[in-house]
Amino acid sequence: MGEVTAEEVEKFLDSNVSFAKQYYNLRYRAKVISDLLGPREAAVDFSNYHALNSVEESEIIFDLLRDFQDNLQAEKCVFNVMKKLCFLLQADRMSLFMYRARNGIAELATRLFNVHKDAVLEECLVAPDSEIVFPLDMGVVGHVALSKKIVNVPNTEEDEHFCDFVDTLTEYQTKNILASPIMNGKDVVAIIMVVNKVDGPHFTENDEEILLKYLNFANLIMKVFHLSYLHNCETRRGQILLWSGSKVFEELTDIERQFHKALYTVRAFLNCDRYSVGLLDMTKQKEFFDVWPVLMGEAPPYAGPRTPDGREINFYKVIDYILHGKEDIKVIPNPPPDHWALVSGLPTYVAQNGLICNIMNAPSEDFFAFQKEPLDESGWMIKNVLSMPIVNKKEEIVGVATFYNRKDGKPFDEMDETLMESLTQFLGWSVLNPDTYELMNKLENRKDIFQDMVKYHVKCDNEEIQTILKTREVYGKEPWECEEEELAEILQGELPDADKYEINKFHFSDLPLTELELVKCGIQMYYELKVVDKFHIPQEALVRFMYSLSKGYRRITYHNWRHGFNVGQTMFSLLVTGKLKRYFTDLEALAMVTAAFCHDIDHRGTNNLYQMKSQNPLAKLHGSSILERHHLEFGKTLLRDESLNIFQNLNRRQHEHAIHMMDIAIIATDLALYFKKRTMFQKIVDQSKTYETQQEWTQYMMLDQTRKEIVMAMMMTACDLSAITKPWEVQSKVALLVAAEFWEQGDLERTVLQQNPIPMMDRNKADELPKLQVGFIDFVCTFVYKEFSRFHEEITPMLDGITNNRKEWKALADEYETKMKGLEEEKQKQQAANQAAAGSQHGGKQPGGGPASKSCCVQ
C-alpha cells in the first residue's frame, strides 16, 4: 500500500466530519488545553512601565487565571495580582491588610507588605510576629474598612485620616494613596492599599477603574479561599462537637475523666501545638476550721483573685496535652504556681474576668515576660495563645482551657475563637452530667443512710427478741448460737395454740390480746401453714421479721400493727378455713400471708389523695397507688436485710415468684383498683359453677396463673375490709377507730390544706356515721363477700357477719333519721307558731303594712 498524501487525508476528513471530530477529541483536545493552560513565559514585559495594548492586557488576565488555577495558597494568588496591579497602575508599592477580630475587637493586620512589580513573595509575606496592626479608627485603611468604599488620597499631608507611624517605622515617605476594600457580601475581608504613583502626582480616576477591575480577581480569590477556610473550620467544628459529644456521654461519673476523654479525642482537630486545661475548685464557702485562723488573726485573709461568683481561684488540677514532637499527656494534681501553663497568670486572669483572651504575639505581652528561653528541652516557646473559660449551665466558671501556637504559624483568628468556644461551651454544659450523677450518688447514699437509721429503730434488737426466743433464759446463749431444734423447742412453748386463740376463725378479735401476743400469733401461722420446715426459714429470722413488722407500723389510730395483723389473720383464715389454699402452692401461700402482714406498714393515717394534695414526696416518687407502693417497698426493704429475710433459703426462681406475688397482693389493696378487678373475679366465680367436680375446677385453677392472681387480689381486698364482717361488738369499736382516723385527716385538710373535707372525713358530721357505713357496705363491701360465699361456701360466715352489721348500722341510721325528722318537724311547728303570733300582732299584715304571705316568712 502506497504512502497516503496530506491531500487525501484532508479529503477523507472533510467527507467524514463525525470521525474527524471523534478522533480530535480523543487524541488532541486534552493536550491542546493542557498546553494552553500550562506554565509558560509571560507574554508581557514587566521590566519597565509602559502603556499596554489590548493583547498585552488579555495576556495579563490569562496569566492571572492560570495562577489562580495552579496555586492553592491565597497569599500567592493575591501577590501575583498585586504585582501586576503595580505595573498597571505604575505604583511604587502595594500592601494587603487582612480584616480580623481579636477578643471581639476588629482590626487590620498586614499580610503582604511592600509589594512591587519585581517583588518576591517570601520578602513581602509578613510573619505573625512582624505584623503591623491598625485599629479601625486609625489610618486610611481603617477609614476604608469602616466606609467600605474606595478611597483616593492625592496628598497624604492634607488627609485627616492619614497616619505616618508606618512611614516612621520603615523610613519611607507616603505621598499619595489609593485603597479599596475586598468584600464578601457585606463583610470586609481585606484592604488593598496602593501607594505613590510613579509617573504622576497622584492616582487618577482611570487608576481607580483599573484597580476595581483587577480587584475582581483578588475578590474572587479571597472569596474562594475564605469560603474554603470557613468550610474547613465548620468541618473541624462539627467533628470536634461530634467526637467530644460521644466521649462526654460515655463518661457521666467524673468531670475530670469526662473532660480528658473529650479533649484527648479531638486533639487532631484543634490545630495547635499544645493545650492545657485547668480545673477550678468549686468550693464557695470554707469550713469553719479554715476560717477560724483568719478570724483569730493567726493567718492573713485571702487577698488573691476571685471568680465572678466570688470563689477563690484555685486550680486543683491541670491537664497538659503536648501534640508537637512526641505526643504526651500530663496530669498535675495541685499544680505549683510556677507550672508553665499557670506561671504567666493568663489562666487566672481569664478565670477572674470570664473573658476570652486571644494573644497573637505572646513575647510582646506582659503575661509572657517570664519567657526568656525555651520552656523545655524540645526548644518549644509560646508564640500565640488563645485562652477561654469553661462555663457551666449555672454560669459558673469550672475551668480554663488555653491553646498554644497554631500549627501553621499564624495567630489564632476569629474562627478559631468560635471553634474553641463551641468546644468549651459544650464541655461546660456537659458538666451537668457528672453534677447530676454526683447529686444522684449523694441522694442514693443518703437513702442508704436513712434506711439504715430506719432499720436500726425498726429492727428487732437482741433484747426484744428475748421476749419470744428466750435463749438466754433457757440455754444461756444468744439465738444465733443455738441450733434450729433448740429454737423450735423454745417457740413450741412460747407460741399460742391456734385453736385456743381461734386464729383460723373469721370472727377472731385482736382486742383482748397485747401486741406482743399478736406477734406470736403471726409466727404461729407460718407453722400452721407448714412452710417453716419446707422452705428452711431460719426461726430466728422469722421471729425478728414479725417483731420488726410490728415496730414498722406507726402508732396511729387505725392503720397500726393491729390492723396489719388482722389482715394477715384473715388471709390465713381464707386459705385454711375458707379452703382457698387448694388453688395455691405452699410458696404462694407463704408470700400471700407475708404480703398481708406487710400491706399497710408505715401507714401515715392519711389516704393517697391527701398525699397528692399535700405534695408529699411519696406522691412524687410513685405515680399511682402511692401508699401501697410505699408499703411494698418498706416490706421488701426489711426482707433485704439478712437477719430478717425469711426468703433467704429460696432458690432464685422461688424468690422471684414470691416477690412477684407480694407485689400484686399489696398493690391490690388500693381500692381504686378494686372496681377494675371485681368484674373479672365475678366471671371466675361464674365459671367455677360450670365444672362438674371440685377436683376438675381446682386442677384448672392451679394451672392458670392469671386467674390465681385475680383471686389473690380479691382476697387481699376481702382481708383489708374484713373488720366490717366481725361480730357487732368488735365491728362497732373498729368502725369508730376508722372514723376517728378519717376525722383526723379531715382536720388536716381543713387546717393545713385550707379545704373542706368530704362528709366521711368531716368531724362536724359525725352523727352521719351510721348512714355512711350503710352506704360503704352497700357500695363496696357486700359484693366481695357475696361473691366469695358463692365461690366457696366455707366463707359464708363473712357474708353473714356483714349482713348482720348492716342491719345494726341501718337501725342506727334509721334512728338518727327519725330523730332528725322529729327535730325538723318541731322546728317547722315552732316557725309556724312564731308566724301566727306575728300575724295576729299586726292584724294579718306584715310589719311593713303589706298583706301577710301564706307561703313564706321573713325572719
UniProtKB/Swiss-Prot annotation:
Residues 483-816 form the PDEase domain. Its main location: membrane. The modification Cysteine methyl ester is found at C856. CDD domains: HDc. It catalyses: 3',5'-cyclic GMP + H2O = GMP + H(+). It is found in: Cell membrane; Cell projection, Cilium, Photoreceptor outer segment. The keyword Methyltransferase does not apply. The modification N-acetylglycine is found at G2. This is Rod cGMP-specific 3',5'-cyclic phosphodiesterase subunit alpha. Coiled coil: none annotated. Residues 841-851 have a biased composition (Gly residues). SUPFAM superfamilies: GAF domain-like, HD-domain/PDEase-like. The active site is at H559. Oligomer composed of two catalytic chains (alpha and beta), an inhibitory chain (gamma) and the delta chain. Its cofactor is a divalent metal cation. Residues 857-859 form a propeptide. Residues 830-840 have a biased composition (Low complexity). A lipid is attached at C856 (S-farnesyl cysteine). Its EC number is 3.1.4.35. The keyword Hydrolase applies. SMART domains: GAF, HDc. It is a lipid-anchor. A divalent metal cation 2 binds at D600. Residues 821-859 are annotated as: Disordered.
